[in-house]
Swiss-Prot record:
GO terms for molecular function: ribosome binding; rRNA binding; translation initiation factor activity. The keyword Protein biosynthesis applies. One of its GO terms (cellular component) is cytosol. This is Translation initiation factor IF-1. Residues 1-72 form the S1-like domain. The keyword rRNA-binding applies. Belongs to the IF-1 family. Component of the 30S ribosomal translation pre-initiation complex which assembles on the 30S ribosome in the order IF-2 and IF-3, IF-1 and N-formylmethionyl-tRNA(fMet); mRNA recruitment can occur at any time during PIC assembly. HAMAP family: IF_1. The gene is infA. Coiled coil: none annotated. SMART domains: S1. Its main location: cytoplasm.
Amino acid sequence: MSKQDVIEVEGTVIEPLPNAMFRVELQNGHKVLAHVSGKIRMNFIRILAGDRVMVELSPYDLTRGRIVYRYK
């Protein structure tokens, strides 16, 4: 899957889950299960409930995503 195939949306972290997973509510009201991307993990960026994040969704499974950016 190339970079141009992903769907980028903004959302808010509702709750942290085990194994670096998070439940994120998107701006359109949908709730997705998202994991942290490798670059965020490498740079030790903490993500807490209430944070605004950018999520990449695959067009094949719109219920799961990857957190690629945490807004300040």
